[in-house]
Amino acid sequence: MATNSNDGPVITAVEVSRVFGSGATAVTALSAISLTIVRGEFLAVTGRSGSGKTTLLNLLSGLDRPSTGTVHFNGNDLAELRESDLVEMRRHKIGFVFQSFGLMPLLSAQENVELPLHIGGMSWRERRQRATEALQAVGLGTRARHRPYELSGGEQQRVSIARALVAQPEVVFADEPTGELDTATARSIAETLGDVAASRRATVIVATHDLDLAAMAQRRLDLVDGEDATQG
């Protein structure tokens, strides 16, 4: 893999398309999307359900491969990387936040955040320090010992954000992170994601139909039926 650099874009997509199926049953989920994402940017990918938001995030994060076009992460063409390289990239360079919180119900907030580091073989002392810092970063330093059922929906999503941050990733992908939250809580989560981009120099890419969340991003990419419909 190429050497990482603090200069230049973190992600570049060129004429990326994704087609599922073939022949008469083929469905085009994305069509010729091009974009450049710089370090520390907060980008919102917006559109209605089925517009291609999740498909785009999957391509940009290396979870899926485009049918045509290229995606580069830190200068590396993802199509040329081995699966083991992609796994390593996602483990150390990328954090994921989803609509469903995905927390282990019998583990505390601290233990949930530590879990990826524990699986990766990090020492107890280092993973405890990192998890504590990540929980403090999302405003849950005093709730570290609480289990998910003792936390509100917004607090559970903050735990999932802390879990995404604990490996100190370069990019955080968030797929509909406010979809199960009320308006006030959703706004608070949006502010937290904005703070991540601003204070931790992580790039944040959010797929959302929540216009309030999108308004807090530095830039929007609007998708309509898999095509870039961004105005201006």
Model-assigned labels for residue ranges:
Residues 9-224:
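ABC family nucleotide-binding domain
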Residues 1-19, 229-232:
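ABC-family P-loop ATPase nucleotide-binding domain
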